[in-house]
Amino acid sequence: MSLLDVLANQHAAMMPEEYKHRSVDEMEQRVVDIKRAFGSKLFIPGHHYQKDEVIQFADATGDSLQLAQIAADNKEAEYIVFCGVHFMAETADMLSKKNQKVLLPDMRAGCSMADMANMKQTDRAWEQLTDLFGETILPLTYVNSTADIKAFVGKHGGATVTSSNAKKMLEWALTQKERILFLPDQHLGRNTAFDLGISLEEMAVWDQIEERLITDQPLSRIKMILWKGHCSVHEKFTVRNIEETRKRDRDIQILVHPECTHEVVTASDLAGSTKFIIDTIKEAPAGSKWAIGTEMNLVKRIINQHPDKQIESLNPDMCPCLTMNRIDLPHLLWSLESIEKGDPVGFIQVNEDTTKDALLALNKMLIIK
C-alpha cells in the first residue's frame, strides 16, 4: 500500500499545534526523559538522511534495510519509533516480532520514488510485458518500494535489492530468467546493469503512465526493463554540476549515489551506496577534496565529521529530502509522548498476506551470497 493510499483510507492524526510552540530545550529534555523511562522497551532507528535534531536521539543509524534488520534483531523493544519514511517503517514492521509496535512520527513522511509504482500500475505492466516476452521475466525491486510491490516481486519469484548489493542480486537474477523488470528506480537499475556489461541498447524503459515500453531495439535484444521511477533528490545532480566543480578545482573528486542519472554516474570518479560514501570519506586522507552527490543532511553531517577534509555538495543549491524532513523534533516528541500516554499515534502495520509474500523477496536477498 502506498503512502497516498494510507492517507486516503485512514485519518492520519495531525500533530497538535502546541508542539510547534514548545522550546527546543524543553523538547530535547522530554525526549531524554522518555527514553530513560522506557529504557530498552523503546528503540529509535534513524535514517542517514534525518536532521541532526532527530539523529541525536537515534539508538542506531543506517540505511533503510540496515535499520529494519537492526530493529528486527532487537528482542527487547516493545516500541520501534522509526525516524525515516513510510516504506522503511513498513519493512521494519514486516521483519519485527508480532508483539512489537512500529510507529512513524509523521504519517506524511513518504517517498515519491516508492509511490511511483503502485499495484494497479504494476499488475497492468506485468500483464502487458508477459504478453510481449512470455515467461522470461523476473522482477527485482529496490528496497525503496512499498510493501505491496515487495509482495508482488516475492510472489513472482523475485527479490529485493539494496544499492549496496544490487550488482550481486542482478547477477543472480540473470541466472534465473532472460530478462529483468527492475522497480521502481530506473537509474539504479540502469547503472547496475551497465556495470555488469549490459549495454544501454539492451535496456528498455516501462512508462507506467502511458503503459508502453520505450525502446528502439528489437524486443529480442532487451535484457533489462526499467520502471520509469526516480529519486527526486538524486535526479537533481547534473553533469553540468560536475563540469563546473572540476573547472573550479581540478583536484576535487566526485562521489555520487547510484540513484543519480547514468550520465552523472559515468562522469563521476566514484559511485556507491550511502554506506560506501560514508566509508570512502572516512578512509580518505586528510586534505583530500570531495564533492558529494547525495542528500544534503547527510552531506552536511559528513562535512562536520571530517573537518580535516575539504567536502562540499556537488550541487550547492540542493535541498534535503523534503518528505524525510517531515520527521523533526516536535513530531518525534509527539510520537514518544503518545506512547507514554498509552495511545500511540502513527502505528504502521502491514497485513499478514502482504507480509508473507514480501518476506519471500526480502529473505531471498538475505540468503543470496
Swiss-Prot record:
A single MF term (Gene Ontology): 4 iron, 4 sulfur cluster binding
Subcellular location: Cytoplasm
EC number: 2.5.1.72
Cofactor details (free text): Binds 1 [4Fe-4S] cluster per subunit.
UniProt pathway annotation: Cofactor biosynthesis; NAD(+) biosynthesis; quinolinate from iminoaspartate: step 1/1
Any Gene Ontology CC annotation: cytosol
Cofactor(s), by name: [4Fe-4S] cluster
Keyword Transferase: yes
Pfam family, one: NadA
Residues holding [4Fe-4S] cluster: C111, C231, C321
Record: residues binding iminosuccinate: H47, S64, Y142, V143, N144, S163, H257, P258, E259, T274
Keyword set, alphabetical order: 4Fe-4S, Cytoplasm, Iron, Iron-sulfur, Metal-binding, Pyridine nucleotide biosynthesis, Transferase
Class of this enzyme: transferase
Gene Ontology BP annotations: 'de novo' NAD biosynthetic process from L-aspartate
Function: Catalyzes the condensation of iminoaspartate with dihydroxyacetone phosphate to form quinolinate.
Family affiliation: Belongs to the quinolinate synthase family. Type 3 subfamily.
Name of this chain's protein: Quinolinate synthase
Organism expressing this protein natively: Bacillus pumilus (strain SAFR-032)
